[in-house]
From Swiss-Prot:
GO-annotated molecular function: ATP binding; UDP-N-acetylmuramate-L-alanine ligase activity
Xref: PANTHER family: UDP-N-ACETYLMURAMATE--L-ALANINE LIGASE (PTHR43445:SF3), UDP-N-ACETYLMURAMATE--L-ALANINE LIGASE-RELATED (PTHR43445)
Record lineage: Bacteria, Pseudomonadati, Pseudomonadota, Gammaproteobacteria, Enterobacterales
Database matches in InterPro entries: Mur-like_cat_sf (IPR036565), Mur_ligase_C (IPR004101), Mur_ligase_C_dom_sf (IPR036615), Mur_ligase_cen (IPR013221), Mur_ligase_N (IPR000713), MurCDEF_pg_biosynth (IPR050061), UDP-N-AcMur_Ala_ligase_MurC (IPR005758)
Subcellular location: Cytoplasm
Known role: Cell wall formation.
Top-level taxonomic group: Bacteria
Entry protein name: UDP-N-acetylmuramate--L-alanine ligase
Recorded metabolic or biological pathway in which this protein acts: Cell wall biogenesis; peptidoglycan biosynthesis
EC number annotated for this UniProt entry: 6.3.2.8
Length: 491
């Protein structure tokens, strides 16, 4: 950003008083890195620490940030404020050093709230669909020439980044309920896509507590703000009388203010009509598969319509929507002759979904768009607590694929829980008599164990939130072909 652009921005968004150097602990996370990127472009000195380099840290290095690939007390020296990821423990040496030096330590969402303070904030919350909906809203506002700032939890593929500093008055941000930190945000508009039991350790295992927290989040809206909520979701329908703010509903339901009608999917695209109050019907072509993405688009359209954005800009943005990283992310289609000697091809799709509802939506999108394909899923459960709490739901949804390969649970720092492991889950699924799951004990064996089950007309879904995304990219790089010891050594 040049001096003239920065001066224009400062006329809208004042500089944070006495803050020059901002240090991020856990800077390599998508949400943390996105905020750091916006602040770097605003002219602040940025430093941060993480355990290993990744594309997020590389992008920040390119912007002039200082990155430490360790956690040491001296890393916070001279920082005006320290921003901490929810994944970082209180005994982290940098956090301890910051407290000792009386440097303010704040959570990620508190810094996001500061970015939102002087802008027209649009926050997207909900158990599922936040990242994609945030990207859709951002794409529509950009297409309309409003030059928004956005901070997303996933890669916005059209922009090639998780976050971007715009010169307009809008800030569009994903709001994270996993640690209840979204309560720091005070947006003008809030979308809630759905509410399900997840991250229940944050809410003391009490679903009523989770529901009340969403209500509290919506009460952060000013009385002239607006809540945009999916009325198809039974929990949201239950909570509507308690919102106490102007509300627009959306969904397939007949009583939705913005209603999805006549949905059909052809390959990776959805086609449907949106019915809006006092507006002409909108015939949408959405470059994203699945009924769940039609709902995400309906939320984005509801917000854009309320803002007065032209229908043509909305339609252009949705038809050209490029999606987000690891959300039904098409990685290629590969011939099987070099893989297992069979004719034909296999499509490879990478998807972040790790809750049964998300996995179910991904499977349905795959079946609707490619009904004749042999559907093969490589699944990595994420967290032992989630596997335990949603065990039966996982067992039910995973039987919907034709072939299932399962990696060990990605612990995300949790200790193992007896009976909440992949071997037990495979045994339960096998006992239901629909499919015979294959346990993959070592990620290095994925290509070797995948090759024999491919038929030549396959769609492979690589599914999960752990390190399985790296496995998906590795499969794409080797074009699904199992590697010989010599090839592995060469790599």
């Amino acid at each position: 950003m040049n001096t003239q652009q920065l001066a224009k921005l400062r006329s809208i968004v004042p500089e944070m008083r006495r803050v020059r150097h901002i240090h991020f602990v856990g800077i390599g996370g998508a949400g943390m890195g996105g905020i750091a990127e916006v602040l770097a472009n605003e002219g602040y000195q940025i430093s941060g620490s993480d355990l290993a380099p990744n594309p997020v840290t590389q992008q920040l290095l390119n912007l002039g940030a200082t990155i430490y690939f360790n956690h040491r007390p001296e890393n916070v020296r001279d920082a005006s404020v320290v921003v901490v990821s929810s994944a970082i423990s209180a005994d982290n040496p940098e956090i301890v050093a910051a407290h000792e030096a009386r440097i303010p330590v704040i959570r990620r969402a508190e810094m996001l709230a500061e970015l939102m303070r002087f802008r027209h904030g649009i926050a997207i919350a909900g158990t599922h669909g936040k990242t994609t909906t945030t990207a859709m809203v951002s794409s529509i506002y950009a297409e309309a020439g409003l030059d928004p700032t956005f901070v997303n939890g996933g890669l916005v593929k059209a922009a090639g980044v998780h976050a971007r500093l715009g010169h307009g008055r809008y800030l569009i941000a994903e709001a994270d309920e996993s640690d209840a930190s979204f309560l720091h945000l005070q947006p003008m508009v809030a979308i809630v896509t759905n509410i399900e039991a997840d991250h229940m350790d944050t809410y003391q295992g009490d679903f009523e507590n989770l529901k009340q927290t969403f209500i509290n989040f919506l009460h952060n809206l000013p009385f002239y703000g607006r809540a945009v909520m999916c009325v198809d979701d039974p929990v949201i329908r239950e909570l509507l009388p308690r919102v106490g703010r102007q509300t627009t509903t959306y969904g397939f339901s007949e009583d939705a203010d913005v209603r999805v009608e006549d949905y059909q999917q052809i390959g990776p695209q959805g086609h449907f009509t949106l019915l809006r109050q006092d507006k002409e019907p909108m015939c949408v072509t959405l470059n994203a598969p699945g009924r769940h993405n039609a709902l995400n688009a309906a939320a984005a359209v509801a917000v854009a319509t309320e803002e007065g954005i032209d229908d043509e800009a909305i339609l252009r943005a949705l038809e050209s929507f490029q999606g987000t990283g690891r959300r039904f992310d098409f990685l290629g289609e590969f011939p099987l002759e070099p893989v297992n000697g069979k004719s034909g091809t296999a499509m490879l799709v990478d998807d972040y979904g790790h809750h049964p509802t998300e996995v179910d939506a991904t499977i349905k999108a795959a079946r609707a768009g490619w009904p004749d394909k042999n559907l093969v899923m490589l699944f990595q459960p994420h967290r032992f607590t989630r596997t335990r709490d949603l065990y039966d739901d996982f067992a039910n949804v995973l039987t919907q694929v034709d072939t299932l390969l399962m990696l060990e649970v990605y612990p995300a720092g949790e200790a193992p829980i007896p009976g909440a492991d992949s071997r037990s889950l495979c045994r339960t699924i096998r006992g239901r008599g629909k499919i015979d799951p294959i346990l993959v004990p070592d990620p290095a064996q994925v290509a070797e164990m995948l090759a024999p089950v491919l038929t030549g007309n396959d769609l492979i879904l690589v599914q999960g939130a752990g390190n399985i995304g790296k496995i998906a990219r590795s499969l794409a790089e080797i074009k699904l072909k199992p590697q010989t010891p010599e090839e592995e050594q060469h790599d």
